[in-house]
Amino acid sequence: MFIKDIDFHVVFSDFSQKHYLKRFKKKYTKEWEFTEKAIIESLKRIYRLKDTNRLDCIKFSAPYGLFKFDFAVAGTQKSPKKSGNRIILFLDNEQENVNILLIYHKDDLEKRRSETEAWKYLIKHNFPNIWKKLFNNFDEI
């Protein structure tokens, strides 16, 4: 796995803004602004996170990668892992972009599927071009 040692451009997908980001903003009004800035700054320098327990590589197929990033909301006194807050992101080394596809608390996802099955379903059906780049139409991770 190779992540460029540069500052990436970080964006929230429209899907993440419409579906989950609003919940964080509403629930953590004052804390969220600081948290969002911290997330962007962390992911901007994602190469620094690659050897930590906060960033899990789901799939890497050069020059692309799909990662899960754990984060905590400022002022909650919870560790990023234990907070249950997650980001699923797409890294494009060629374009030097990090696209936040999903931002959620694990309890936000539908209960009839496991957490992994739920986000896989959302990525596959809402970001088909990204899915194809990483999996060539296969369901395997």
What are these regions (language model features)?
Residues 1-44, 129-141:
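Arg/Lys-rich, positively charged N-terminal/basic patches that mediate binding to nucleic acids
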